[in-house]
Amino acid sequence: MASEPASATTTVAVPDEARDRARELGWEDGLIDAALARGFSLQEVWQALRAGVDGATARSFLESGQRGPQPDLRWMTVPTEWGIRARPSDPAMGLTIGDINVGTYGDVPDTWPHRSEIARGSYPKPAMEDMGYTIFDKAVVWADCVVPLYEQAIRDRWAPATDLRWASLEALPEDVERAVSQLMTELSERSYHQGVELGRWLPEISYGFLEAKLFLSTVIFDLARHTEAFRKRALVNGGAVGLQAPTDYMRAVTEARSYPELLATLFIQDSTLLTLYRNGDRFAQSQLERDLFALAARDRERLLQYQVQRLKHYLFRHPERRDEQHIYFTKAENRVGKEWADPAVSGPLALLLAGGRERIAGGLTALREFRRQQVAEYQAHLAAATIPRERLGGRLWAIVKPADA
């Protein structure tokens, strides 16, 4: 609140210590009283004294007629691109992040030059703190599709609490409910773990690649939603959360030492889970589960599109890193192959494919065919990313190889 000017009839008692401090600083006698008469408060005088303002500066300031410090308006003249008038390219979509990528603000450099949290297009200060970013290479994280995918993601909202008809579930045979609960336990855990790992890497990506960071934030939210929805299904129909999912593959994800290694390791899970969700009606025991798989598939489709386009762009910019990616794929495939052989992973799917415990042998045969479908689609997605892969990791190949191979 601004200080009120002292009136002519108001006497302000100036403490002796204030006058003593003024003399130490070279204030001539009467300068404090002159400042008070000019309308400055005793508190403002004290602030000047404590700040060490000398007498000459104080006298000059009073003689200038200024009531207070003048604002520094140099921020109004920084040489950023002025006169931008972004407009929606599609009125139905509104003003998108793509629409504001105009002029220099839409230029995403191949290498981001700043280590601070400067926004793209801002004018940098002479010196700023290093904020700890480690990813400055656009090719590592970028795909042009992140811009439209972000817009799709923020519009494709669904809430497990209200968009799934939980009250519609009916009791299932115990063996079937146990299989559903175990599958949902695994899917919830995998969603949670992937969201945690992506969240761990998000702060490493420089602010200059804002659109990629925005899209990845929607992926993390999608995975949190999947964690919630699958866990709810395990606990809503008389079942329970089942046995912990195997962690060999999750460990490989956690051990990734770079963002390209992380995404290469996640590629097989992103692809095979998308195939699972798209074929959810083969495992679903209710309309709610069909709806749940369909909604989860929509989210996973966006993530896999980013995976394919990012890897394609990365290999175009860094062809020398192609062989390295195969190392990561082999490691991930072997971990997945080991987990697919785990009874806690294969058993529930086989039972659900068969329709019951007594027919599980036929379900195991059907599951082997489904695994082949998952792997074939995984290979197709890699081919779309310009890195075809005919030779698979041995443990994965053992699951899907033909009987006569």
How does the language model describe each region?
Residues Q194-T254:
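Long, hydrophobic, well-ordered secondary-structure blocks that form the structural core
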